[in-house]
């Protein structure tokens, strides 16, 4: 059994929400990569993107994932774009049981349509279209990176989701 559980998926798929509850029920530590980045930079993800750019952010994200994945007994919530870097997935595969929270486009849209903290979605007129386009580009990477895929929709029960992940992790 691997030491950690890493949650991957598109922004808004529930990685942080599921991760917090999963860590609590399994008596593990919870690590939100975006929050670690914000603490490191003393700035919001939005501000980092605007002031230093996406390349800087992705480099920092890689560094933080490498550092945090070396810890034991953690549930790690990754950023939605973390799978775009092969090094992130390579490291997570070495140390973590990877779960893809496969949320529907409708679910993602409902969760993200009024959100202003996601730099990629800011100043975008048709958020649903951008979500569809980005998810289409990323979905294969999420799928091939995952040890387990769990489907998420707007009616998914978080407790059932956590129970499924816990059960699969224990028997893995």
Swiss-Prot record:
<dbReference type="GO" id="GO:0008652">
    <property type="term" value="P:amino acid biosynthetic process"/>
</dbReference>
<feature type="binding site">
    <location>
        <position position="16"/>
    </location>
    <ligand>
        <name>Mg(2+)</name>
    </ligand>
</feature>
<protein>
    <recommendedName>
        <fullName>Shikimate kinase</fullName>
        <ecNumber>2.7.1.71</ecNumber>
    </recommendedName>
</protein>
<keyword id="KW-0028">Amino-acid biosynthesis</keyword>
<dbReference type="GO" id="GO:0009423">
    <property type="term" value="P:chorismate biosynthetic process"/>
</dbReference>
<dbReference type="GO" id="GO:0005829">
    <property type="term" value="C:cytosol"/>
</dbReference>
<dbReference type="GO" id="GO:0005524">
    <property type="term" value="F:ATP binding"/>
</dbReference>
<feature type="binding site">
    <location>
        <position position="58"/>
    </location>
    <ligand>
        <name>substrate</name>
    </ligand>
</feature>
<keyword id="KW-0479">Metal-binding</keyword>
<dbReference type="InterPro" id="IPR023000">
    <property type="entry name" value="Shikimate_kinase_CS"/>
</dbReference>
<comment type="function">
    <text>Catalyzes the specific phosphorylation of the 3-hydroxyl group of shikimic acid using ATP as a cosubstrate.</text>
</comment>
<feature type="binding site">
    <location>
        <position position="80"/>
    </location>
    <ligand>
        <name>substrate</name>
    </ligand>
</feature>
<dbReference type="GO" id="GO:0009073">
    <property type="term" value="P:aromatic amino acid family biosynthetic process"/>
</dbReference>
<keyword id="KW-0418">Kinase</keyword>
<dbReference type="Pfam" id="PF01202">
    <property type="entry name" value="SKI"/>
</dbReference>
<dbReference type="GO" id="GO:0000287">
    <property type="term" value="F:magnesium ion binding"/>
</dbReference>
<feature type="binding site">
    <location>
        <begin position="12"/>
        <end position="17"/>
    </location>
    <ligand>
        <name>ATP</name>
    </ligand>
</feature>
<keyword id="KW-0460">Magnesium</keyword>
<comment type="pathway">
    <text>Metabolic intermediate biosynthesis; chorismate biosynthesis; chorismate from D-erythrose 4-phosphate and phosphoenolpyruvate: step 5/7.</text>
</comment>
<dbReference type="InterPro" id="IPR031322">
    <property type="entry name" value="Shikimate/glucono_kinase"/>
</dbReference>
<feature type="binding site">
    <location>
        <position position="138"/>
    </location>
    <ligand>
        <name>substrate</name>
    </ligand>
</feature>
<keyword id="KW-0067">ATP-binding</keyword>
<comment type="similarity">
    <text>Belongs to the shikimate kinase family.</text>
</comment>
<keyword id="KW-0808">Transferase</keyword>
<dbReference type="InterPro" id="IPR027417">
    <property type="entry name" value="P-loop_NTPase"/>
</dbReference>
<comment type="subunit">
    <text>Monomer.</text>
</comment>
<keyword id="KW-0057">Aromatic amino acid biosynthesis</keyword>
<feature type="binding site">
    <location>
        <position position="118"/>
    </location>
    <ligand>
        <name>ATP</name>
    </ligand>
</feature>
<dbReference type="GO" id="GO:0004765">
    <property type="term" value="F:shikimate kinase activity"/>
</dbReference>
<dbReference type="InterPro" id="IPR000623">
    <property type="entry name" value="Shikimate_kinase/TSH1"/>
</dbReference>
<keyword id="KW-0547">Nucleotide-binding</keyword>
<keyword id="KW-0963">Cytoplasm</keyword>
<feature type="binding site">
    <location>
        <position position="34"/>
    </location>
    <ligand>
        <name>substrate</name>
    </ligand>
</feature>
């Amino acid at each position: 059994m691997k030491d950690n559980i890493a949650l991957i998926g598109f922004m808004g798929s529930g990685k942080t929400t599921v991760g917090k509850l999963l860590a609590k029920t399994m008596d593990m530590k919870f690590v939100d990569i975006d929050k670690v980045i914000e603490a490191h930079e003393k700035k919001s993800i939005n501000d980092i993107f605007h002031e230093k750019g996406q390349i800087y952010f992705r480099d920092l994200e890689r560094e933080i994932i490498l550092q945090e994945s070396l810890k034991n007994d953690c549930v790690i919530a990754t950023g939605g774009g973390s799978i775009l870097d092969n090094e992130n997935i390579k490291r997570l595969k070495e140390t973590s049981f990877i779960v893809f929270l496969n949320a529907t486009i409708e679910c993602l849209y409902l969760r993200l349509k009024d959100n202003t903290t996601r730099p990629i979605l800011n100043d975008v007129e048709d958020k649903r279209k951008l979500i569809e386009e980005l998810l289409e580009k990323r979905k294969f990477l999420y799928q091939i990176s995952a040890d387990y895929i769990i489907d998420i929709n707007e009616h998914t029960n978080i407790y059932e989701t956590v129970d499924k992940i816990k059960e699969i992790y224990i028997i893995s």
